[in-house]
Amino acid sequence: MSRPLFGGALSAVFPSSVMDISELRQIPDNQEVFAHSQTDQSIIIELLEYQSQVQDADAARYHFEDVAGSNKAIENGTWEVRVVEQVPQSEISMQECSSAWLLSGAQLVSKFNEEAKNTVNVHQCLFRLPQFTTDILMTFNDPVFINPLSSSAAGNMEAIPWTLQDFQGVLQSLRLLDSGVFG
């Protein structure tokens, strides 16, 4: 079932076991944050300023590095970009974007500013909408190694995690319903 985003201006289909984090805590107006109900996985959708100074293929890397900075994973060896590839228009519902880019990488991040760092695979899809001076960034955080000293170490080992295919289903289903969201 399609879930409304940003007051119904966008929508997407999410995997089962999704929790809307805005029901638990305050989320910035430019973000929608969802978490797996039993794992530390999350999917974040952000409306960001269009980065006109960055070419399309490099824009995905630009936003990844910005997220790495927010995650305090900016030192050498704490993040890597594995692949950046264009998503064919035929594979997405967001027909208003000039291009879409899928990036896969990893970051060493700590939860709640803890010392213990977890290895998180980060998959991002960047939808470029220059006509609205907006980049839509969708991020799938998929922890693959949890440090034994992390507060996440006591996680549910029986939980069925989301897959990359689940994330691709979300990004393929993202639709713009009301361009007024861009101001």
Curated annotation (Swiss-Prot):
Location of the region described as Interaction with RAN in the Swiss-Prot/TrEMBL record: 23-66
Pfam families according to UniProt: Mog1
Gene assigned in the entry: rangrf
Organism: Danio rerio
Protein topology in the membrane: Peripheral membrane protein
Gene3D superfamilies according to UniProt: Mog1/PsbP, alpha/beta/alpha sandwich (3.40.1000.10)
Subunit structure: Monomer. Interacts with ran.
Protein name as annotated: Ran guanine nucleotide release factor
Keyword presence, Protein biosynthesis: no
Record keywords, A-Z: Cell membrane, Cytoplasm, Guanine-nucleotide releasing factor, Membrane, Nucleus, Protein transport, Transport
Top-rank taxon, per record: Eukaryota
GO terms assigned for molecular function: guanyl-nucleotide exchange factor activity; small GTPase binding; sodium channel regulator activity; transmembrane transporter binding
Coiled-coil ranges from the UniProt annotation: none
InterPro entries: Mog1, Mog1/PsbP_a/b/a-sand
